[in-house]
């Protein structure tokens, strides 16, 4: 397959549109230049959220993670068992949570602030959302957020097996046109990738305000055996959990009269 054809297929199947919105302010540009390289994950290197050796001492002085800029275009294969064992030994018992498509970042930042002993990995392809989170990282002195500005599938390939204790996919683009539904993020392929990186007993939370998408999600889960739906009654998917902060998008959905579905699944 030619590189041109492979690129066109990747663009056709991605679950997001254009990455850049309006021109960043001077401060936002400075955050992208100075802060993003210190919190961005480098997918060209083995799984490492807490650096070791000299880099660990440097990071302790700076109060942040890797000082190297992320390679946002070239994913690496999954790390070897030896690399994974070494990094988990360095990280100790620290939990890692993953949010795919964090949008404006309100949920990601809230979880980071309320769970300081957890490392939050946020994945978002759009610059506007990344800049908002970088602003909160700088203003609130948050040290437990790591970012990937790119395709979520790249980070799901990069993460080691059974490394994530909780994952969030909140109100992803529903791609309402029938011809575009193959772009929907929650699909059997993505579920298989999530199943690989999530620990047994880990919780996966998915939110949507589109009834058709909710049905599609439940159909995808019913066709696999890696996750079980935690709902025991209607209130379990109609009522937002107390530790699920309401975002501006959810508030807009409520104002417009759209039903919000709060779906929780457990990795078995």
Region roles according to the model:
Residues 219-268:
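Class I S-adenosyl-L-methionine
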Residues 157-166, 171:
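A short acidic, Gly/Pro-enriched loop at the edge of an enzyme's catalytic core
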Residues 95-154:
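SAM cofactor-binding core of SAM-dependent methyltransferases
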Residues 1-49, 86-98, 106-113:
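S-adenosyl-L-methionine
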Residues 200-208:
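Conserved beta-strand signature within the Rossmann-like core of class I S-adenosyl-L-methionine
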Residues 186-200:
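A short glycine-rich, Lys/Arg-flanked "PGG" loop and its adjoining helix->strand segment in the class I
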Residues 53-58, 84-85:
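Glycine-biased, low-complexity coil/linker segments
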Residues 167, 194-195, 204, 217:
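Class I S-adenosylmethionine-dependent transferase superfamily signal
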